[in-house]
């Protein structure tokens, strides 16, 4: 019997409340390991992890690398800039090449939505989505949930305000799916130009005014203004954006006194968040980074190891 019934982690969509709770509970155990003097275990000894990042990443890639090493895996970071991809090799060709090397888990980040799902159909190993276009970023949502649960003691019946560039954010999508699954009350706060069509169908409350959206919120989750994904003029100016939608001390007063301030990083200080708030007593941004390693340890162990501490067989779950 395998406790976690999925072979891959492509998105939050498809995970049950039980699945999510299982991963968060296992991540809690990983936090303890990460805080020990001796952090390395032999859980994934003899297994190979390949990190395949087609988009630049510091936090996510280093977090996955550290998670794999703490579990005892052999970790390889594939540099796309120096790979055959730059010479015209397709994603599928790359997948077939890597599959021939018999890795046990492939961690992939790609600019195209659906890239991780496509790879999972072409390789024999487990696939973890580290972000695919504007689609999903499941481990970010899990680490955010773990951060909230450890601080608040629960996820159900809390108010979470997700603020900023929702349109271009895979982080927002995954968080909305997870928080709804766990019984939280989710709000999105953004100008109309930075909201996707059909946002109201995602079981969220929509606000265009920060103070209204933050009223009595337990958690304020800021999103990076993703200028690299913008093809048009979504905001009049950075200065005006910060004036209306940047989180400063005055706007934060609308939330509960003990509200958590979160940001997935990297932050644009003075754009979506003021420095005194990012570095203030309500900020749990550094805790999010710590929880990221623990969550990724939990995900890899859950995908690769069965309940009797042996490697999982091929083709388990979906």
From Swiss-Prot:
GO MF terms here are: amino acid binding; aspartate carbamoyltransferase activity
Keyword flag Transferase: yes
Cellular component GO terms, alphabetically?
A: cytosol
What are the protein's UniProt keywords?
Pyrimidine biosynthesis, Transferase
Superkingdom, according to UniProt?
A: Bacteria
**Where along this sequence does the record place binding of L-aspartate?**
87, 170, 224
The family database entries (PROSITE patterns) matched by this protein are listed as: CARBAMOYLTRANSFERASE
Enumerate the InterPro entries for this protein.
Asp/Orn_carbamoyltranf_P-bd, Asp/Orn_carbamoylTrfase, Asp/Orn_carbamoylTrfase_sf, Asp_carbamoyltransf, Asp_carbamoyltransf_Asp/Orn-bd
Might you give the EC number(s) for this enzyme?
2.1.3.2
Where is the chain membrane-spanning? Answer: none
Positions of carbamoyl phosphate binding:
59-60, 109, 137, 140, 265-266
Example GO biological process: 'de novo' UMP biosynthetic process
**What is the catalytic activity of this protein?**
carbamoyl phosphate + L-aspartate = N-carbamoyl-L-aspartate + phosphate + H(+)
**This protein's pathway:** Pyrimidine metabolism; UMP biosynthesis via de novo pathway; (S)-dihydroorotate from bicarbonate: step 2/3
Keyword ATP-binding appears in the UniProt entry: no
Q: What does this protein do?
A: Catalyzes the condensation of carbamoyl phosphate and aspartate to form carbamoyl aspartate and inorganic phosphate, the committed step in the de novo pyrimidine nucleotide biosynthesis pathway.
Family statement? Belongs to the aspartate/ornithine carbamoyltransferase superfamily. ATCase family.
What this protein is called in its record is: Aspartate carbamoyltransferase catalytic subunit
- Biological source species: Allorhizobium ampelinum (strain ATCC BAA-846 / DSM 112012 / S4) (Agrobacterium vitis (strain S4))
Please spell out the taxonomic lineage of the organism that makes this protein: Bacteria, Pseudomonadati, Pseudomonadota, Alphaproteobacteria, Hyphomicrobiales
């Amino acid at each position: 019997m395998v406790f976690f019934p999925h072979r891959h982690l492509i998105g939050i969509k498809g995970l049950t409340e039980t699945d999510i709770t299982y991963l968060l509970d296992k991540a809690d155990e990983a936090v303890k390991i990460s805080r020990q003097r001796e952090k390395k275990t032999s859980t994934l000894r003899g297994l190979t992890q390949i990190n395949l990042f087609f988009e630049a990443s510091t936090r996510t890639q280093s977090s996955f690398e550290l998670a794999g090493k703490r579990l005892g895996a052999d970790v390889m970071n594939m540099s796309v800039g120096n790979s055959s991809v730059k010479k015209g090799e397709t994603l599928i060709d790359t997948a077939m090449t890597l599959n021939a090397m018999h890795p046990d888990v492939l961690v992939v980040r790609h600019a195209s939505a659906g890239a991780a799902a496509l790879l999972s159909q072409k390789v024999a190993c487990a696939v973890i989505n580290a972000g695919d276009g504007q689609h999903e970023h499941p481990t970010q949502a899990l680490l955010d949930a773990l951060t909230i649960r450890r601080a608040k003691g629960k996820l159900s019946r809390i108010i979470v305000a997700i603020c900023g560039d929702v349109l271009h954010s895979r982080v927002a999508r995954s968080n909305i799916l997870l928080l709804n699954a766990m019984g939280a009350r989710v709000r999105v706060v953004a100008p109309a130009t930075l909201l996707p069509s059909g946002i109201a169908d995602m079981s969220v409350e929509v606000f265009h005014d920060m103070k209204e959206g933050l009223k009595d919120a337990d958690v304020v989750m800021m999103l990076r203004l993703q200028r690299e994904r913008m093809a048009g003029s979504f905001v009049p100016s950075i200065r005006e954006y910060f004036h209306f939608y940047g989180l400063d001390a005055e706007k934060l007063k609308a939330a509960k006194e003990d509200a958590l301030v979160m940001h997935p990083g990297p932050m644009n200080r003075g754009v979506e968040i003021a420095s005194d708030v990012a570095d203030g007593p309500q900020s749990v941004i550094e805790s999010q980074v710590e929880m990221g390693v623990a969550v990724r340890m939990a995900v890899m162990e859950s995908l690769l190891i069965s309940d009797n501490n042996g490697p999982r067989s091929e083709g388990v779950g979906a």
